[in-house]
Structures are given as C-alpha cells and as structure tokens.
C-alpha cells in the first residue's frame, strides 16, 4: 500500500478519512482488551487503536506480536481522540486500525529511542542509526537542512557560483596536521585532504569567477573537543574587487536571512565591531561572549607601589569581579578555580571578598593602602568576589578570560536565548609560537597586511597588522576571513617573514606564485563553520549533535571501527610498511 502521509502530520482535518501510515513502533500498550500503538516516523508520533471486536483475528494476532522498533504498515480510519494529549501535535486524533502488516522485526535496542535518554556517548555512536531516530536528533538535522537551504538561496540570488574544489590536494606546512593519502601511481608521494579550499578558491578568482561559494567538507588532524571534529563542513566564500566592508555586508545579510528563516529572529545590522586588542584586554578572548559583563580590569598601575612583590613587580595585574556572589565560593571552590587557572599558564590566583564593607581574604592586608582606589576602580559592593592574576599580559588575559566564561556558566549568568554576533577586526598578522620558537600566521600566509604596517615584514613582525576579520557568536568563532595577497612580490615577502627560503616557498607554493604573474585580481573572502553554526542555533554544546556520523574524542568511529587495519596486499600496492613502536 502507498503511504498516505507522515504519521506526525495527521490532524483534525483528516478525521473521517481512511489513510495508510508506515513507521516504527515507539510503544505498545494493552488496556482493557484494546491494543494501543504509538507509531513514530520522522515527523512525529500518532496513536493507533486496535480493537479485537473490529479487526480480523489475523490483524489481532499480528498486533500481539509487535515490539518496540518493529517496522509496520497500517491502514485505518482517523477519529477524534476521546482523551486529547496536548503534548503531541497529533494529540487530538487517533487511527482506528483495520489492516496491519509487519515490514520488519527488531531486536531489543541497547537504549530507549527517546529524548533525554541516559547512555554513554560511545554507545550512542556505536548505534548511531538508532540514536538518529530520536526526535531531538531528527529536529537537529531538519534545522541543518533549513540553514544550508537558506544559505544556498541567498548566495545564488547574489550570483555566487557554486564550484567544487579538489579533495585530493597538496600538503602544505602551515596550520594543523594534514590527513595524508598515499598515491599508488606515484609511489612515495602523498596527497593531503584539504584543511580548507583556500588556495583553490583564490585561483578561481584569478580565473575570473568573481564570486565563488561552496558548502564543503574539510579535514584537520588535530586534538578534538566539543566544537571540533576531524572532518567538518564550512560555508566557503571568495569574491573579487570587493573591500572588507563589502564582504562583511554580504556575510551579515546571509546571517540575518538564516536567523529569520530558522529562528524567526530579526538580527540588527550592521553587526557590532570590536578590535582584537579590545577583545583580548576586556574579555580575555579573541572570540568574546558579549551576553554578560564581568570585563577584565587592568590594575597594573594601581598596584605598582604596594608592598606585595607578586603584584608590584608583575608585568601585568588584571582582575575580574564576580558581582554579588562571593558567598557562593568557599576556599575549596576557589582552590578549584586556582587549579583551573594554572591550565592557562598562571602561577596562581589571588582573591579578596567584600565582607561588611571591607576587603577580606589572603591578599587583603597588602591592599590596605589602595583599598579606596581599588574599590572605586572596580566599583566594588558587598558580597563581591575579586579574582586577580599577576603575570605577563598574555597569561593574565587568557587566564581571566577562561575564568570569566567558566564562572558565568557555573552561576547561570548567561541568557541562553540570546544570539550575540559581532566582528573582531584589526588582527595581528602573526602570533608567536613557543612550541615552534617563531612567529606563525594568525590566520594563514595569504592574508593581506595593512598598508601602514607592511614595511614591518622585514622588521618587527609583532607590529604587522592584517586586513582580517572574524565573526563571533556567543563566545565561539563562527568564521574568519580576510583580504588576500594578490601581488607576487608581497606574497614572497610574506613567505620570507615566516621563515621560508625561496626554494621552500617555490616547492610548496610555486603554482600560486606563478599564477600571480597572470593578472591576479584583488580578492578576499571568508569561511563559516556550518557545524558550529547549527550547533549554536540548536542550543547544543557539541557539534557531534549536528553531524550525522561523527567521530569520538579519539577520532574514531565506534560504529564502523574506523580507522582500521588494512591488508598486507593493500600496503604492498602503496609501497608502505607499518613499523611497530613498542
């Protein structure tokens, strides 16, 4: 029989009609001789009623065999439900079954197919096809489909061209580790799976495509966390002849359209803008969460003259004030915050509380001389908690920024219904890497430096600024972009500043440098993390919830057991040997 409609879409207007439904048995109940079945499909659940006095003995026998997750086909008459269920969209109606067929049986599932089920993440991933049956998960992927549909329509209307770029590319040394693919034909040579289509999309601008986009899979072999996966999807854009402001206007329009069509939220444009320096100094993060205050305060000058060398001799002393919540933090709680602070390089965490109008705590005695000035600068009030970090400016900012976010979550200070977008602009071109012992690109080596700072490529790299911009949502980097270098001489200077010899630059990027000999236009773009965007719209805290078949924190798939060993024959074809490192 042909399905008439989805079970979750049956409504009062269908009363009096005979329909055919197909789906899964969510629940079966036997009450007073009647059998009640909750039939589930992707659109929801509908109650079926099987009355032994109104169906054949075969139908009744089939109904008695039903168990959870059996796949069935039913035909019946839609009636008004005697006792409505306001919790279901179909709660005003039920189906009086006249015919019933079992299409497939099911073993007892390892967990219940329902929302808020308590089960380990690895079990969910091991049986992902069952996990995805849960209504909450289905809603996540309907939302994801709406977002991608909205984005495609918006960019198509602006005459962007959707172009697929290669999945097998050249490995480059900048950025995260590549996933490498050995070549069978060119033995000893490797492809890399793309971390992004950065260079190929720039070459499309050289080809005259003018406006490119792609919703594309990317790959990075990096340590995983809640908002990262080894393979992820990004909305990739590139344009020619536009300024950074024009590119940002396009992206803002796209964001506003998505928010209106998926959340019915009107986003006020233009979005707020914040410099990188303000973000780091006031929020302790280059992706500030602006849904709450608790800004970082610089006390370096204020504490210079006090008799406490930890403060007076530190390169920087900064603090955050936890307003009106000092009584929520015992010494044991603050010890836990101190251990947390050490993860970000801090040597410790100093603190005082405002109790009975006075400062109290381990360092209060050192602050007596400046108590009035300190209270005024920090706008202190009764029951405030002040947390200090004395260290380098970088460590102080990073530590207090992380503490700020943790405390806001602990104290439930964040309005989860808010969506605060902003641009972070005026980025440094380079970041110092302690691990590498050199400057690295803050974004990538194809970013255009500002005209005012480009001369420092041969001088102080810390002073070089980039024409770069990140879009931030609720403390997450949603995407990043920049204007790109289109002049060969500037690109060669950039590679040299990053420590490449001319031969190394030519070996890695010679094809790009050669392309710059053939009229490369001014261009720029941006990429937005689609998984992360949908995660935030869905109110989740892990992108696994919006990726159909994700990996776990070990970059493994418990369902397929990937990555897995391969046969000796496969290795021989690729001229590879596996060495044991016991």
Curated annotation (Swiss-Prot):
Keywords: Aminoacyl-tRNA synthetase, ATP-binding, Cytoplasm, Ligase, Nucleotide-binding, Protein biosynthesis. GO terms for cellular component: cytoplasm. The keyword Transcription does not apply. One of its GO terms (molecular function) is ATP binding. Its EC number is 6.1.1.12. It catalyses: tRNA(Asp) + L-aspartate + ATP = L-aspartyl-tRNA(Asp) + AMP + diphosphate. It comes from the Bacteria. NCBIfam families: aspS_bact, PRK00476.1. This is Aspartate--tRNA ligase. The lineage of its organism: Bacteria, Bacillati, Bacillota, Bacilli, Lactobacillales. The gene is aspS.
């Amino acid at each position: 029989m042909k399905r008439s409609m989805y079970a979750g879409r049956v409504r009062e207007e269908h009363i009096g009609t005979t329909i055919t439904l197909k789906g899964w048995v969510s629940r079966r109940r036997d009450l007073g001789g009647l059998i009640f079945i909750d039939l589930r499909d992707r659109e929801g659940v509908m109650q079926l009623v099987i009355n032994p006095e109104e169906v054949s003995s075969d139908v009744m026998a089939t109904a008695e065999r039903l168990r959870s997750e059996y796949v069935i086909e039913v035909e019946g008459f839609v009636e008004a439900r005697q006792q409505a269920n306001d919790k279901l969209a179909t709660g005003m109606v039920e189906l009086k079954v006249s015919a019933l067929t079992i299409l497939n049986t099911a073993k007892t599932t390892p967990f219940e197919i329902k929302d808020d089920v308590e089960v380990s993440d690895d079990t969910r991933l091991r049986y992902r096809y069952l996990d995805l049956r849960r209504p909450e998960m289905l809603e996540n992927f309907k939302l994801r489909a709406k977002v991608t549909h909205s984005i495609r329509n918006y960019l198509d209307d602006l005459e962007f061209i959707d172009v697929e770029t290669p999945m097998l590319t050249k490995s480059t040394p900048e950025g995260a580790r590549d996933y490498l693919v050995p070549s069978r034909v060119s033995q000893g040579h490797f492809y890399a799976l793309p971390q992004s289509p950065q260079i190929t999309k720039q070459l499309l601008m050289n080809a005259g495509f003018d406006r490119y986009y792609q919703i594309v899979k990317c790959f990075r072999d990096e340590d995983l966390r809640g908002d990262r996966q080894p393979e992820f999807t990004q909305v990739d854009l590139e344009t020619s002849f536009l300024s950074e402001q024009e590119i940002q206007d396009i992206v803002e329009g796209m964001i506003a359209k998505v928010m209106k069509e998926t959340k019915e939220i009107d986003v006020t444009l233009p979005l707020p803008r914040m410099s990188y320096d303000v973000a780091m100094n006031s929020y302790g993060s280059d992706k500030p969460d602006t849904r709450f205050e608790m800004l970082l305060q610089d006390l370096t000058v204020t504490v210079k003259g006090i008799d406490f060398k930890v403060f007076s001799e530190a390169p920087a002393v900064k603090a955050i004030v936890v307003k009106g919540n000092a009584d929520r933090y015992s010494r044991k709680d603050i010890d836990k915050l101190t251990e947390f602070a050490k993860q970000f390089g801090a040597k410790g965490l100093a603190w005082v509380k405002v109790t009975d109008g006075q400062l109290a705590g381990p360092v209060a005695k050192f602050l007596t001389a400046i108590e009035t000035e300190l209270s005024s600068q920090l706008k202190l009030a009764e029951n405030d908690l002040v947390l200090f970090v004395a260290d380098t400016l970088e460590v102080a900012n990073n530590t207090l920024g992380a503490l700020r976010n943790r405390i806001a979550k602990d104290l439930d200070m964040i309005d989860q219904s808010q969506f605060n977008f902003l641009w972070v602009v005026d980025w440094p071109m380079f970041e110092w890497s302690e691990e590498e012992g050199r400057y690295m690109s803050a974004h990538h080596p194809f970013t255009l430096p500002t005209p005012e700072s480009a001369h420092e490529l041969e001088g102080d790299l810390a002073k070089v600024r980039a024409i770069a911009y990140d879009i931030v949502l609720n403390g997450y980097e949603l995407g990043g972009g920049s204007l790109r270098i289109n002049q060969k001489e500037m690109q060669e200077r950039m590679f040299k500043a990053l420590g490449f010899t001319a031969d190394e630059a030519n070996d890695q990027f010679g094809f790009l440098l050669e392309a710059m000999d053939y009229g490369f236009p001014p261009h720029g773009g941006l990429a937005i993390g689609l998984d992360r965007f949908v995660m935030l719209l869905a109110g989740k805290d892990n992108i696994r919830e919006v990726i159909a078949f994700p990996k776990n924190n070990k970059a493994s798939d418990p369902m397929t057991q990937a990555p897995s060993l391969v046969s000796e024959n496969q290795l021989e074809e690729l001229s590879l040997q596996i060495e044991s490192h016991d």
